[in-house]
Amino acid sequence: MVLEKLKHVPDPTFVHQEPLAEFIANLFTAAGMRPNEARLCADVLVDADMNGIDTHGVCYNLDLHYLTGLMNGYINPTPNVKVTYETPGTAVIDADRGMAMIASVKAMELAIEKAKTTGIASVAVNNSSHYGAAGYYARLALKHDMIGYTMSSGGGRVIIPMNARYPWMGTNPMAFAA
């Protein structure tokens, strides 16, 4: 019976990138986000889909993580993203429970600026939401002829190592761009 249903899967519907990003940004704005930050988050989600990372794009994450989080109050729609610690080559950013995309882009932009002076830089983000597709942030460095490396310790302890009884590792996504 299940296989019979699979024989009649409808053809996919294709949507152009720009109208989709605009629609998603409007949804985020309606959920209380600032328009410029809503558009940034929409662009990150659409970019994931455009790069074949469906698990971190619009269809999988829009409702599951982001809109649900905004509507239920566990994602702050108007965060005060700020640097809480800084040295010439490092920094820590507090995302104020906001969308991780906002703080992650800010972190990479700050790392790029610091690396122009110091040669290498590292910026950490805390107090944020679902990280999204790591490759988006890493690729920001390419525009400045730099190598980008991003990672997250997100997801909590969900991986059970071999011969263990309980989960004690995260999925810890990472991306390189060179």
Describe each PLM feature range.
Residues 56-112:
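Active-site cofactor/substrate anionic-group-binding motifs, chiefly glycine-
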Residues 110-123:
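Conserved catalytic cysteine-centered active-site region
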Residues 1-31:
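Generic N-terminal amphipathic, Lys/Arg-enriched alpha-helix
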Residues 35-46:
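Short, well-structured alpha-helical segments
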Residues 120-178:
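Glycine-rich anion/phosphate-binding loop at the beta-strand->alpha-helix junction
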Residues 24, 111, 137:
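Aromatic/hydrophobic pocket-lining residues that form π-stacking "cages" and hydrophobic walls in ligand
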Residues 27, 92-96, 121-126:
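Short glycine-rich or small-residue beta-strand-to-loop segments that form or flank ligand, phosphate
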Residues 29-32, 49-54:
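N-terminal and secondary-structure boundary signal
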